[in-house]
Amino acid sequence: MLSIHDPLLIFTDLDGTLLNSHTFEWQPAAPWLTRLHESGVPVILCSSKTAAEMLQLQTTLNLQGLPLIAENGAVIQLDVHWEDHPNYPRLIAGISHNEIRLVLHKLREKEQFKFTTFDDVDDQVISEWTGLNRAQSALTRLHEASVSLIWRDSDERMAQFVARLNDLGLQFVHGARFWHVLDASAGKDQAANWLIEAYRQQWRARPLTLGLGDGPNDAPLLDVMDYAVVVKGLNREGVHLRNDDPQRVYRSQNEGPDGWREGMDYFFSRS
């Protein structure tokens, strides 16, 4: 159904998809990453992580120079060859990290919502939360257009909190382990569509798209893909897509990078 020689873009989530959620291992996906790189197929990382974290991961995965989608779509790192773009090197959706911090501070002071943001703690605490080393934990704090937090209040209070955020033009997104507050105009799907259009103009043909993700917050991204791999994950809610046609969507039996490889094998062995 898909060919490595098609005009093709691969969009992939990180934690629980390309990376093992616990060990951060990615090696099972290495043969496919090498093959895609050698064929000139862009692999676009898409995550709640900061751009600083993801740029480091790009180097590890030999994907440096390609675009990436950070902070759940609030930040797009542009391709290194797009220097002439007016927003190079990064496109930011909506208000900044510091503006969101101020909103959250006021909400917490006024309405006593209980949560702990990454800005409230030091690198050591984040290291304990994430399992990352201190240097990597420091990169997780470099948000540009969102705030990550741990929710410590009731479900009822969360509903009130979400309503307040929505009134202020913000959204509350549940990631693999943390919650994220970002501008309502941002999203993995909007960021992916922006990049698809950028490549369409560059290639003078609309690229085929394949997305891979494991969590409910990946559904908007997978919904705008031509083909999708739902990698088996830990989230009990599962991933519900608008179009779950088995011709378009494959659900893996394996988790993490093993499931990532399984999904790639499935779509590229059917042609």
Swiss-Prot record:
It comes from Salmonella paratyphi A (strain ATCC 9150 / SARB42). Belongs to the HAD-like hydrolase superfamily. MPGP family. Mg(2+) binds at residues 13, 15, 214. It comes from the Bacteria. This is Mannosyl-3-phosphoglycerate phosphatase. InterPro entries: HAD-like_sf, HAD-SF-IIB-MPGP, HAD-SF_hydro_IIB, HAD_sf, MPG_Pase. The active site is at 13 (nucleophile). GO terms for molecular function: magnesium ion binding; mannosyl-3-phosphoglycerate phosphatase activity. The keyword Transmembrane helix does not apply.
